[in-house]
């Protein structure tokens, strides 16, 4: 199995790659990689500073028929690509936040109903796109995680790759299990 981590210039993308490469074959790629060059069993859209620097990520989401996990900016790209909305958050910067799991399925299978995660809410999804549903929230953000109704597309606002996030390894394990199907 091969997973590609799309580098959106975020400070934690190397941690995403390290978390995945210990489990399966993984490679970090530029977000300008042509879609026809992407051959993988799954794709992770990493975090980054802004939507303006998201390269071809929207094209990957619209074109590829493989599981995708969007992390932070990756979630926001997913939401906007499919008709959702992203706006500045009320609470900016990185902080620990309590995540409330609304749906224990997919990437959140086996994760407790509440856990602490490291997240930035400088920007956040404020309108969930059609054909997606909200699967986690917090007291500062109504849309902490989403999943598509029929495709294996998932997104989280928090950073499962950092040590400050509880159950981050489980989120990655669940995503890899989805990629194996």
Curated annotation (Swiss-Prot):
Keywords: ATP-binding, Glutamine amidotransferase, GMP biosynthesis, Ligase, Nucleotide-binding, Purine biosynthesis. Heterodimer composed of a glutamine amidotransferase subunit (A) and a GMP-binding subunit (B). The gene is guaAA. The keyword Glycoprotein does not apply. The keyword Signal does not apply. The lineage of its organism: Archaea, Methanobacteriati, Methanobacteriota, Stenosarchaea group, Methanomicrobia. Pathway: Purine metabolism; GMP biosynthesis; GMP from XMP (L-Gln route): step 1/1. Residues 2-181 form the Glutamine amidotransferase type-1 domain. Its EC number is 6.3.5.2. It catalyses: XMP + L-glutamine + ATP + H2O = GMP + L-glutamate + AMP + diphosphate + 2 H(+). It comes from Methanothrix thermoacetophila (strain DSM 6194 / JCM 14653 / NBRC 101360 / PT) (Methanosaeta thermophila). Gene3D superfamilies: 3.40.50.880. Catalyzes the synthesis of GMP from XMP. This is GMP synthase [glutamine-hydrolyzing] subunit A. Pfam families: GATase. GO terms for molecular function: ATP binding; GMP synthase activity. The active site is at 72 (nucleophile), 159, 161.
């Amino acid at each position: 199995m091969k997973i590609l981590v799309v580098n959106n210039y975020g400070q934690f993308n190397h941690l995403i790659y390290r978390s995945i490469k210990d489990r399966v074959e993984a490679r970090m790629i530029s977000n300008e990689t042509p879609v026809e060059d992407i051959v993988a069993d799954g794709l992770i859209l990493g975090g980054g500073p802004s939507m303006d620097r998201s390269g071809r990520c929207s094209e990957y989401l619209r074109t590829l028929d493989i599981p995708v996990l969007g992390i932070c900016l990756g979630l926001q790209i997913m939401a906007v690509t499919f008709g959702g909305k992203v706006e500045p958050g009320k609470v900016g910067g990185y902080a620990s936040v309590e995540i409330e799991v609304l749906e224990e399925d997919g990437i959140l299978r086996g994760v407790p109903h509440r856990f602490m995660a490291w997240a930035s809410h400088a920007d956040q999804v404020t309108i969930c796109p059609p054909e997606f549903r909200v699967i986690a929230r917090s007291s500062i953000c109504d849309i902490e995680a989403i999943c598509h109704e029929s495709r294996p597309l998932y997104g989280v606002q928090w950073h499962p790759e950092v040590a400050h996030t509880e159950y981050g390894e489980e989120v990655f394990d669940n995503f890899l299990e989805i990629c194996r199907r």
